[in-house]
């Protein structure tokens, strides 16, 4: 799939998710974009919303978070604190372009989509908690841009509906990310085999949105067929934000990128044909050799013929055929046996 100038068929698409790791500072956001590029990210992703895009400014119990990193915080207050202000977007997209890193965003309401259109984004991202909103999904599908969907809390029925909507809107560029909507995610809760299930069941391109510590999961995900990896990124460990507890700093993210690139390199193309290096090593394969001096007319037997390394003699498949035949000439111990040596 083509996302901007990036082809996911050729390389795994690695996204640095900035989210709230700007910590309320535009300067921090711009520095993060530059650092993400240096760390090897293919794209920086932001989130485009106002608190009103996501929730109501209510003090009722329904709108108070219970448990986890954000325990007892009011939803509206959380999103007000974590947002990337509209007025930052122009500089964010401009900086990304200047740095040579792709940039796109997750909108959360119609107003956010309309705002983002002025930047002609290369793609859109639908967050896990918005995946059940069919009207919102359709608005995104109508934009005819590659769309990445986190599937963390979506049911199979909802995912099938997303596929149906994108088909109806004639938008074929859909990617499902396996995602566990827990912040942070325990490694035993990842269910990475779900990447394979998403690919097989929905026939879409797949990847991983990872909220676990470290980068074991992204490397394993690549081995399972992930073509997109999304991981939260921050400049350094001194940052305190709503997302910093499960984000990678520069050194960690760079190490993850290196590991992912090694993993995809190790996968190869899946062909079983021997490559040039393997063919060269065939010299150490077994072949048939004289294990004793053999006189002309002497019968080849288990006593004077062995299958040994290296491979300059007859292929071992001729061993049984050779036994019982007579030598056509004198053969010395250690000579590689040839077809001309027997009759």
Swiss-Prot record:
Keyword Zinc: no
Cofactor(s) this protein cannot do without: a divalent metal cation
Alphabetized CDD domains for the sequence: SAF_NeuB_like
Xref: InterPro entries: AFP_Neu5c_C, AFP_Neu5c_C_sf, Aldolase_TIM, Neu5Ac_N, Nonulosonic_Acid_Synth, Pseudaminic_synth_PseI, SAF
Keywords: Metal-binding, Transferase
Domain AFP-like: 287-343
Pfam families in alphabetical order: NeuB (PF03102), SAF (PF08666)
BP terms from Gene Ontology: carbohydrate biosynthetic process; glycosylation
Class of enzymatic activity (EC top level): transferase
Molecular functions per Gene Ontology: metal ion binding; N-acylneuraminate-9-phosphate synthase activity
Substrates-to-products reaction catalysed: 2,4-diacetamido-2,4,6-trideoxy-beta-L-altrose + phosphoenolpyruvate + H2O = pseudaminate + phosphate
SMART domains membership: SAF (SM00858)
E.C. no: 2.5.1.97
NCBIfam families documented for this protein: PseI
Family: Belongs to the pseudaminic acid synthase family.
Biological function: Catalyzes the fifth step in the biosynthesis of pseudaminic acid, a sialic-acid-like sugar that is used to modify flagellin. Catalyzes the condensation of phosphoenolpyruvate with 2,4-diacetamido-2,4,6-trideoxy-beta-l-altropyranose, forming pseudaminic acid.
Protein name: Pseudaminic acid synthase
Organism of this sequence: Campylobacter jejuni subsp. jejuni serotype O:23/36 (strain 81-176)
Lineage, opening ranks: Bacteria, Pseudomonadati, Campylobacterota, Epsilonproteobacteria, Campylobacterales
């Amino acid at each position: 799939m083509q996302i901007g100038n990036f082809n996911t068929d050729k390389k795994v698409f690695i996204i640095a998710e900035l989210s709230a790791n700007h910590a309320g500072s535009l300067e921090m956001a711009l520095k993060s974009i530059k650092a993400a590029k240096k760390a090897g990210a293919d794209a920086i992703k932001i989130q485009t919303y106002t608190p009103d895009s996501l929730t109501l400014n209510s003090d009722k119990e329904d709108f108070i978070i219970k448990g986890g990193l954000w325990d007892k915080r009011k939803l509206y207050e959380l999103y007000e604190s974590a947002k990337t202000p509209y007025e930052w977007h122009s500089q964010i997209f401009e900086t990304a372009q200047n740095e040579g890193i792709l940039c796109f965003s997750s909108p959360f309401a119609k107003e956010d989509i309309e705002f983002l259109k002025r930047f002609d984004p290369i793609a859109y991202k639908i967050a896990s908690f918005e995946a059940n909103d069919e009207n919102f999904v359709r608005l995104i599908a109508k934009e005819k841009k590659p769309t990445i969907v986190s599937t963390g809390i979506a049911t199979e029925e909802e995912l099938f509906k997303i596929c149906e909507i994108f088909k109806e809107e004639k938008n074929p560029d859909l990617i499902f990310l396996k995602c566990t909507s827990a912040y942070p995610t325990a490694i035993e809760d990842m269910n990475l085999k779900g990447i394979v299930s998403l690919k097989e069941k929905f026939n879409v391109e797949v990847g991983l949105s990872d909220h676990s510590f470290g980068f074991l999961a992204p490397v394993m995900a690549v081995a399972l067929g992930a073509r997109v990896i999304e991981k939260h990124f921050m400049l350094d460990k001194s940052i305190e934000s709503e997302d910093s507890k499960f984000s990678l700093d520069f050194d960690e993210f760079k190490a993850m990128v290196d590991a992912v690139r090694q993993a995809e390199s190790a996968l190869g193309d899946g062909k079983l044909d021997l490559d040039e290096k393997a063919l060269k090593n065939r010299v150490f394969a077994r072949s048939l050799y004289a294990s004793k001096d053999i006189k002309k007319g002497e019968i080849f037997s288990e006593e004077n013929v062995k299958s040994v390394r290296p491979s300059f003699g007859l292929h071992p498949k001729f061993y049984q055929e050779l036994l019982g035949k007579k030598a056509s000439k004198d053969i010395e111990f250690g000579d590689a046996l040839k077809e001309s040596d027997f009759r």
